[in-house]
């Protein structure tokens, strides 16, 4: 639609607004939200009929979770429909970065869908083989990293910059590809582990999307990039449109995921969203900033790594339960307290992350 409407700009001046990324980002946000609002109830009813018992609830989880039994999962299908449909309408599809991000999103979403399918059919929280799942994720991430490195649309830089230290730069060289794989796969699984309470993951996802929407817009603009002394990556500005679609789809999904949730995001959505944000961070050359903006996700995945590692070494646990949001539930926090307090942390971390654009 972007190309069609811009063609009219030479004849009808009002169509010039479609040249502006900011306008199209707003359009993508509204469109994706409407897609989820309109088709959401149909998708939820269909999934409820097909899944029967819905997503299985962990037997060792907090007692308050057992009342959620029967809630359908795979709500990520709603989110992906909104993002992809809206992005194809509003984004400039001549940007290779748009295609890379959307394909990673679809790839990770497909892996998550199969994982959800196995969990529902087997009625077990153990789905897809961990090794096979990670292997597929690394293959998809590796292809994305290779395309970003050899896309030919702009001079490529393999340098890694650090917030608050503009003079400290590491040239990754060919290590850029394995490093990017680590970022993308790590982001996907970090968001996946965060998705354990109603509304817990989707709001921080939208916050991260908004933050990286700003970063993508600035990175794709030569004037702003030079002023802020950040990497100028032509074409990444269009990722702001995709991220606008993420926010819109997230708002639509939250309408149905607000407690008591009518549907869960599932791995279909959480893996896809994490992979999307991780790929944007790699494309815009802000991988380290992702650690700050997505700090909540980082803490969640670290809590699992620490819990598993320490238990294997000592037979004891560091946390009452991992990921860490369940630890706080076990301490007596209500679900709403955990969710809202984690949202607040996500907002603070996003503001800190954005501040690094100027404080260099």
Curated annotation (Swiss-Prot):
It catalyses: UDP-N-acetyl-alpha-D-muramoyl-L-alanyl-gamma-D-glutamyl-meso-2,6-diaminopimeloyl-D-alanyl-D-alanine + di-trans,octa-cis-undecaprenyl phosphate = di-trans,octa-cis-undecaprenyl diphospho-N-acetyl-alpha-D-muramoyl-L-alanyl-D-glutamyl-meso-2,6-diaminopimeloyl-D-alanyl-D-alanine + UMP. Its EC number is 2.7.8.13. Its cofactor is Mg(2+). Keywords: Cell cycle, Cell division, Cell inner membrane, Cell membrane, Cell shape, Cell wall biogenesis/degradation, Magnesium, Membrane, Metal-binding, Peptidoglycan synthesis, Transferase, Transmembrane, Transmembrane helix. GO terms for molecular function: metal ion binding; phospho-N-acetylmuramoyl-pentapeptide-transferase activity; UDP-N-acetylmuramoyl-L-alanyl-D-glutamyl-meso-2,6-diaminopimelyl-D-alanyl-D-alanine:undecaprenyl-phosphate transferase activity. The chain crosses the membrane at residues 27-47, 71-91, 93-113, 134-154, 168-188, 199-219, 239-259, 262-282, 288-308, 337-357. One of its GO terms (biological process) is cell division. It holds the Pfam family Glycos_transf_4. The keyword Cell membrane applies. InterPro entries: Glycosyl_transferase_4 (IPR000715), PNAcMuramoyl-5peptid_Trfase (IPR003524), PNAcMuramoyl-5peptid_Trfase_CS (IPR018480). Catalyzes the initial step of the lipid cycle reactions in the biosynthesis of the cell wall peptidoglycan: transfers peptidoglycan precursor phospho-MurNAc-pentapeptide from UDP-MurNAc-pentapeptide onto the lipid carrier undecaprenyl phosphate, yielding undecaprenyl-pyrophosphoryl-MurNAc-pentapeptide, known as lipid I. Belongs to the glycosyltransferase 4 family. MraY subfamily. This is Phospho-N-acetylmuramoyl-pentapeptide-transferase. The lineage of its organism: Bacteria, Pseudomonadati, Pseudomonadota, Alphaproteobacteria, Hyphomicrobiales. The gene is mraY.
């Amino acid at each position: 639609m972007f190309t069609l409407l811009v063609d009219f700009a030479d004849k009808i001046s009002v169509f010039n607004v479609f040249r502006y990324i900011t306008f199209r980002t707003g359009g993508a946000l509204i469109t994706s939200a409407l897609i989820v609002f309109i088709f959401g109830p149909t998708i939820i009813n269909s999934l409820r009929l097909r899944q029967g018992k819905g997503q299985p609830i962990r037997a060792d989880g907090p007692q308050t979770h057992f009342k959620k039994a029967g809630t359908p999962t795979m709500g990520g299908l709603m989110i992906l429909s909104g993002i992809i449909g809206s992005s194809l309408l509003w984004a400039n599809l001549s940007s290779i970065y748009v295609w890379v991000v959307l394909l990673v999103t679809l790839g990770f979403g497909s892996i998550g869908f199969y994982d959800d399918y196995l969990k529902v059919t087997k009625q077990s929280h153990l789905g897809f083989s961990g090794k096979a799942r990670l292997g597929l994720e690394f293959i998809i991430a590796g292809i994305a990293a290779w395309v970003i490195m050899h896309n030919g649309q702009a001079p490529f830089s393999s340098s890694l910059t650090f917030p608050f230290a503009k003079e400290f730069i590491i040239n990754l060289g060919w290590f850029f590809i394995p490093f990017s794989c680590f970022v993308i796969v790590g982001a996907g699984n970090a968001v996946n582990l965060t998705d354990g309470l109603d509304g817990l993951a989707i709001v921080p996802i939208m916050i991260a999307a908004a933050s990286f929407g700003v970063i993508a817009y600035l990175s794709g603009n030569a004037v702003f990039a030079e002023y802020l002394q950040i990497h100028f990556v032509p074409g990444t500005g269009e990722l702001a449109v995709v991220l606008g679609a993420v926010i819109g789809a997230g708002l639509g999904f939250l309408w149905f995921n607000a407690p008591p949730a009518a549907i869960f995001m599932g791995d279909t959505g959480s893996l896809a969203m994490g992979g999307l944000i991780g790929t944007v961070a790699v494309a815009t050359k802000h991988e380290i900033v992702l650690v700050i903006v997505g700090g909540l996700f980082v803490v969640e995945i670290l809590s699992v790594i620490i819990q598993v590692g320490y238990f294997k070494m000592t037979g004891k646990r560091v946390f009452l339960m991992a990921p860490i949001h369940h630890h706080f539930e076990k301490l007596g926090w209500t679900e709403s307290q955990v969710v809202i307090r984690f949202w607040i942390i996500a907002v603070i971390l996003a503001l800190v992350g954005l501040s690094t654009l100027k404080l260099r």
